[in-house]
C-alpha cells in the first residue's frame, strides 16, 4: 500500500491562496493592469480562486486567462508526439500588463518555461510573475516563483498530488 501524507487540506489551501492574493496586491500596488493566467489543468481553477479573493479584498475584477502549454513542452515522449491540444483562452490584451502565471506545483521549471514561451506568442507583457500553490524544489531551469503557497522539500522519488474540487472533487495536497 502506498503511503501518503496530507500536506494541505481545504482550509490550508484557502489560507495559502488568501495570502498569495494579498501578496500580489502588495507587490503590484493593487490590481490595476494585473491579469491572472492559469496553466492548464489545475492552474486554471487556482487562478479563478485568486481572482475571487482579489475581488473580495480590493473590490475590483481581475481578468483570468487559460494557457494550454501542450505544444510548448520539451518533455513529451515519443508516444506523446501527437498531443491533444485544447487551446489557450486569453481574451484580454496582455501587452504592457502584469501577467501572473498560476500553477499548482513548481518542480523542475519545465512547465513554467513552456508557459513563458506560450505567453510571449500571445503578447508582450510588461512583467511576468509566477504564483504556485506548492514549490517542491529540484529545479532543472533557473526559475523561481514570486508567490508560493507552501514550500514542500521532497526527494525526486516522492510525488506531490494536488487535488482541486473543480477537477478532482475535493481540495487537498498530498505527498506520496
Swiss-Prot record:
Entry keyword set: Glycosyltransferase, RNA-binding, Transcription, Transcription regulation, Transcription termination, Transferase
EC annotation from Swiss-Prot or TrEMBL: 2.4.2.9
Residue interval(s) of motif PRPP-binding: 99-111
InterPro entries: PRibTrfase_dom (IPR000836), PRTase-like (IPR029057), PyrR (IPR023050), PyrR_bifunctional (IPR050137)
Alphabetical list of CDD domains matching this protein: PRTases_typeI (cd06223)
Protein name: Bifunctional protein PyrR
Keyword Transcription part of the UniProt annotation: yes
Assembly with partners or alone: Homodimer and homohexamer; in equilibrium.
The keyword Lipid metabolism is assigned to this record: no
Species, as recorded: Alkaliphilus oremlandii (strain OhILAs)
GO molecular function: RNA binding; uracil phosphoribosyltransferase activity
Family per record: Belongs to the purine/pyrimidine phosphoribosyltransferase family. PyrR subfamily.
GO-annotated biological processes: DNA-templated transcription termination
Class of enzymatic activity (EC top level): transferase
SUPFAM superfamilies for this protein: PRTase-like (SSF53271)
Organism phylogeny: Bacteria, Bacillati, Bacillota, Clostridia, Peptostreptococcales
Amino acid at each position: 500500500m502506498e503511503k501518503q501524507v496530507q500536506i494541505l487540506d481545504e482550509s490550508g489551501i484557502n489560507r495559502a491562496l488568501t495570502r498569495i492574493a494579498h501578496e500580489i496586491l502588495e507587490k503590484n500596488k493593487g490590481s490595476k493592469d494585473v491579469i491572472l493566467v492559469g496553466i492548464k489543468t489545475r492552474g486554471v481553477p487556482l487562478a479563478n480562486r485568486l481572482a475571487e479573493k482579489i475581488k473580495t479584498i480590493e473590490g475590483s475584477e481581475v481578468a483570468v486567462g487559460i494557457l494550454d502549454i501542450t505544444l510548448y513542452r520539451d518533455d513529451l515522449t515519443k508516444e506523446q508526439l501527437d498531443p491533444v491540444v485544447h487551446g489557450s483562452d486569453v481574451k484580454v490584451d496582455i501587452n504592457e500588463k502584469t501577467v501572473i502565471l498560476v500553477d499548482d506545483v513548481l518542480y523542475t521549471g519545465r512547465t513554467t518555461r513552456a508557459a513563458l514561451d506560450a505567453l510571449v506568442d500571445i503578447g508582450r507583457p510588461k512583467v511576468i510573475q509566477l504564483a504556485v500553490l506548492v514549490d517542491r524544489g529540484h529545479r532543472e531551469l533557473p526559475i523561481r516563483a514570486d508567490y508560493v503557497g507552501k514550500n514542500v522539500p521532497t526527494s525526486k522519488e516522492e510525488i506531490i498530488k494536488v487535488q482541486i474540487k473543480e477537477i478532482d472533487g475535493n481540495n487537498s495536497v498530498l505527498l506520496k
